């Protein structure tokens, strides 16, 4: 059994609607172990750095504005096939076509305010986890 780690973010719209506990409960119900977690309010520089790969895309400015609009909760999740399983559980970016039972189907407002983020590959998970957490802050079981 090979455990993977992935980064999850509970985004500003979900934090503002008091959905943190609900989302965390659903993650644990799906077998994810939370091995690191913190709440923070990104500034513009932090948001631009995290989403640097999208800098030249049309939605970049709106994304940065949204991600700095209120606090977020960042988590490191661990389980077998964590990246793929969390991507599936999140649902598609557009909540109008997200599958019933996914986090975005349940909680997302629109494509920008889609409540959660998840790493899209193991390599990106490692980079994204390191962006928010020092090794000493992660309690792998």
From Swiss-Prot:
The active site is at residue 117. Its EC number is 2.7.4.6. GO terms for molecular function: ATP binding; metal ion binding; nucleoside diphosphate kinase activity. Coiled coil: none annotated. Keywords: ATP-binding, Cytoplasm, Kinase, Magnesium, Metal-binding, Nucleotide metabolism, Nucleotide-binding, Phosphoprotein, Transferase. One of its GO terms (cellular component) is cytoplasm. Its cofactor is Mg(2+). It is found in: Cytoplasm. Its main location: cytoplasm. Major role in the synthesis of nucleoside triphosphates other than ATP. The ATP gamma phosphate is transferred to the NDP beta phosphate via a ping-pong mechanism, using a phosphorylated active-site intermediate. NCBIfam families: PRK00668.1. Belongs to the NDK family. Homotetramer. This is Nucleoside diphosphate kinase. The lineage of its organism: Bacteria, Pseudomonadati, Pseudomonadota, Gammaproteobacteria, Pasteurellales.
């Amino acid at each position: 059994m090979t455990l993977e780690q992935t980064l999850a973010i509970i985004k500003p719209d979900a934090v503002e609607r008091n959905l943190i506990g609900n989302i965390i409960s659903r993650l644990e119900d799906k077998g994810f172990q939370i091995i690191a977690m913190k709440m923070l309010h990104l500034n513009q520089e932090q948001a631009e750095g995290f989403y640097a790969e999208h800098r030249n895309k049309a939605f970049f400015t709106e994304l940065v504005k949204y991600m700095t609009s209120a606090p977020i909760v960042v988590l490191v999740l661990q389980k077998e096939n964590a990246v793929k399983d969390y991507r599936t559980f999140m649902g598609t970016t557009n909540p109008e076509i997200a599958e019933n039972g996914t986090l975005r189907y349940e909680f997302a407002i629109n494509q920008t305010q889609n409540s959660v983020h998840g790493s899209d590959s193991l390599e990106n998970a490692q980079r994204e986890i390191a962006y928010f957490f020092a090794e000493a802050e992660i309690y792998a079981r």
